[in-house]
C-alpha cells in the first residue's frame, strides 16, 4: 500500500494563511479525524480543525481532491488555516498521530506527481525554478517550462529521432530490397533536419540557463585600477569601498545584478600584485581562485597610466596565466582623466571597452557588450528555463547526431547510425524523465522545499 504523507505547503513563519497538504490513500481518514467528515471533491468547505479530544485547534477552509484529479495524482486533502506557526505545528502534530501518516520529504509531493505521470521531470524542476526566480523574465520562463513548453520541444525531437530510427532499422532488417534506403537521400535529409531542430532548442536552452543560473563575471586587475568603482557603477549603489589607496579591497566582494533581465554575479577581487602583507596575499590568492571559476573576466586597466595600460605587458603578466578557453573583456578605465571618449574596439583578439567608472561614461557600452558576449537576447518570447543537466543532455545528443551523420555519409554504416540514434533518444529522454536513474531523481527532488 502506498504511504500517506503530510507537510506544510506554505513557507514557515508568521503569515496570514498557512496550508497543510496531505497526499495518499489515507487522506479521507485524515479528513474524518480532523474535520469530522470528508468534503465533497473540489468543493471548499469552511470547518473547524479538531484535536484528538475534540478541542478546536483552528478553523478554515478544507479542500479535497480525489485521485487521479489532483496535483500528485493521489487523494489530496488541503487544510487552509491561519498562518501562525504554533497553530500549524499543533495541527501537523495531530495529523502525524494518525497511524500510517508520515512527514513528507523535501519535494516529495512533486516527486509523486512525476511518478504518477501528472507532470514530467522538466516540469517538476520548473516548480522549484519558479519559486526561486530572481527576475520577472525568469519567472515567466519558468512558468512556460511548467506549462510544458520545453518538454514539448524535447518530445518533438524524440519523435523525430524515433521515426528516423525506425526507417534506418528497416533498411538494415530488409537488406534484400531493391531500394537502398541508406543511399536514397531521405535519411540524410531527415538527419540534418533533426540536427538543425536540436540546434534551435540548444540556443533557446542556453538563454534559459542564463536566466536561471546567471553568469559569473570576475573583475580583476592591478590595485587602484578602478575595479571597485566599476562594481559600484554596475550595481547602481555603493557596494564597495573606494579610496585612492592601492589595495583597499582585500577580500572578494559579490553583487547580484540584472542587465535587461540577464542575471549576473559580479565579483570584485583584490588587486593583483606581489604583496608583502599577509592579509593582502590571502585576498590575491582568493582572487585567482575566483578567476579560474569565472564565466568571463573583466580585466581592468588604468588608461591614465601608460605602463599599466600596455597590452603587451598585460598579456605576459596576466593573460598568459589564464586558461585559453576563458573569455576576457578588457576595460580601459579612467578615460575622464585623459579626455578620451567612451568607445568599444578590438585589439589582439580582445574586446576593449574604454570608459570611466567614476563618471559612468561608457558603462552602458559595457552592459551591452556583456549581454552580447553571454549570448543573451532581450525580450525573446516563448522562452523556457533550462538547467545545466538539460544543456549537458542536449550537447551529448548533438555530438551523437554528428557522429551518426559521419557514419552515414562517409561509411554508409546503417547499424552504427542506428546505435547513435538510440543514444540520442536516450539523452533527450533524460530531460523529461522517460529514462532516468533513481539517483538523479533523488538529487533533483531533495533540493525542493518541504511541502512542494
Curated annotation (Swiss-Prot):
SUPFAM superfamilies: P-loop containing nucleoside triphosphate hydrolases, TrmE connector domain. GO terms for biological process: tRNA methylation; tRNA wobble uridine modification. Its main location: cytoplasm. It is found in: Cytoplasm. InterPro entries: G_TrmE, GTP-bd, GTP-bd_TrmE_N, GTPase_MnmE, MnmE_dom2, MnmE_helical, P-loop_NTPase, Small_GTP-bd. Pfam families: MMR_HSR1, MnmE_helical, TrmE_N. K(+) binds at residues 224, 243, 245, 248. Mg(2+) binds at residues 228, 249. Its cofactor is K(+). GO terms for cellular component: cytosol. The keyword Chaperone does not apply. CDD domains: trmE (cd04164), TrmE_N (cd14858). (6S)-5-formyl-5,6,7,8-tetrahydrofolate binds at residues 21, 78, 118, 452. GTP binds at residues 224-229, 243-249, 268-271. Its EC number is 3.6.-.-. Exhibits a very high intrinsic GTPase hydrolysis rate. Involved in the addition of a carboxymethylaminomethyl (cmnm) group at the wobble position (U34) of certain tRNAs, forming tRNA-cmnm(5)s(2)U34. Belongs to the TRAFAC class TrmE-Era-EngA-EngB-Septin-like GTPase superfamily. TrmE GTPase family. NCBIfam families: mnmE_trmE_thdF (TIGR00450), PRK05291.1-3 (NF003661), small_GTP (TIGR00231). PANTHER family: TRNA MODIFICATION GTPASE GTPBP3, TRNA MODIFICATION GTPASE GTPBP3, MITOCHONDRIAL. Homodimer. Heterotetramer of two MnmE and two MnmG subunits. This is tRNA modification GTPase MnmE. The lineage of its organism: Bacteria, Pseudomonadati, Pseudomonadota, Gammaproteobacteria, Pasteurellales.
